[in-house]
């Protein structure tokens, strides 16, 4: 069974964007993270998916430079996730393509997920 947890960005709690964590419950495990989504307004901008090699890859789902506000939100999200802004790298991406040079380890993703689960402001 899949569960979805949505949170406002820590660095922009009142802006119209949110992070969504999708988990899956298995019989042996509980709440295994399978997908991260970033939304600006109601538009899915970026998905972070786990590949078969165990690493997590970002996939651009919409043009991140659509507006100045969306650009700022993507900048804040990537700064939270990577520790630095990756806005320009995402801006150069084609839609539905992943960036192999922006791979993330499972430890980084789990730390990001736990950070939100412990103290994030829920998005309803």
Language-model-derived ranges and their functions:
Residues 1-124:
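Terminal leader/tail segments of proteins
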């Amino acid at each position: 069974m899949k569960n979805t947890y949505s949170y406002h960005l820590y660095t922009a709690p009142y802006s119209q964007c949110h992070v969504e964590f999708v988990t899956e419950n298995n019989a042996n495990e509980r709440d295994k993270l399978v997908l991260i989504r970033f939304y600006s307004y109601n538009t899915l901008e970026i998905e972070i998916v786990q590949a078969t090699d165990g690493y997590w890859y970002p996939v651009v789902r919409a043009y991140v430079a659509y507006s100045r506000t969306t650009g700022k939100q993507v900048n804040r999200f990537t700064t939270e996730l990577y520790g630095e802004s990756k806005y320009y790298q995402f801006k150069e991406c084609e839609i539905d393509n992943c960036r192999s040079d922006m791979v993330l380890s499972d430890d980084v993703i789990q730390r990001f997920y736990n950070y939100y689960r412990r103290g994030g402001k829920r998005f309803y």
